């Protein structure tokens, strides 16, 4: 399966979010949408829920709504792809500092947990690998750094954390969208 839908550009999405006055960064919005999808909400109710969570229940303007639909479709496609094409939507480029990326990652994770929690209200009851991953995400959401730290070392650590978060999101998606039966399924004999 290939990704048919493309994500809007990060700066373009930032402009739409600022024009709408949502108070969210593109990374936070993507985290929220990703959390909702990973929690099992992949039907048409995602947009009104997003309005409730980010815009006091009011619909977004046309440009932002279109960009968010693209983001949702591309994210959903990437999460369902066997090639694991899902990536965190973080600022990138030469003009983006490692500190900006760390802040964006913390915002992404916080909003991912919000989206996941809205669709899976019993997150604290989740056990096993997924439960551990959710606990780790809660810790990552508190991510801090010292601006005196070696930026190269911080960049390497950040890349490892980003990859861990990506895999944790995929694990959540697999857990909540493909639930495992709690007891062995017993097939009843077919009467002819």
Swiss-Prot record:
Pfam families attached to this UniProt entry: UPF0149 (PF03695)
| Record GO cellular component, one term | cytosol
- PANTHER family referenced in this protein's UniProt entry, alphabetically: UPF0149 PROTEIN YGFB (PTHR37528:SF1)
**Family per record:** Belongs to the UPF0149 family.
Extract the NCBIfam families matched here. Answer: PRK01736.1 (NF002477), ygfB_yecA (TIGR02292)
User: What is the protein name stated in its UniProt record?
Assistant: UPF0149 protein YgfB
């Amino acid at each position: 399966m290939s990704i048919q839908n493309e994500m809007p550009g990060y700066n373009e999405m930032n402009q739409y979010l600022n024009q709408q006055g949502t108070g969210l960064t593109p990374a936070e919005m993507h985290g929220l949408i990703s959390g909702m999808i990973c929690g099992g909400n992949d039907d048409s109710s995602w947009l009104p829920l997003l309005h409730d969570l980010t815009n006091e229940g009011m619909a977004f303007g046309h440009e932002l709504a279109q960009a968010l639909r693209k983001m949702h479709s591309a994210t959903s496609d990437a999460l369902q792809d066997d090639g694991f094409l899902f990536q965190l939507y973080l600022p990138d480029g030469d003009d983006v500092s490692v500190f900006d990326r760390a802040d964006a990652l913390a915002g992404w994770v916080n909003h991912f947990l919000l989206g996941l929690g809205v669709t899976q209200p019993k997150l604290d009851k989740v056990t096993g690998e997924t439960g551990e991953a959710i606990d780790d995400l809660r810790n990552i959401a508190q991510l801090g750094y010292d601006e005196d730290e070696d930026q190269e070392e911080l960049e390497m650590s950040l890349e490892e954390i980003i990859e861990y978060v990506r895999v944790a999101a995929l694990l959540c998606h697999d857990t909540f969208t493909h639930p495992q039966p709690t007891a062995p399924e017993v097939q009843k004999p077919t009467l002819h």
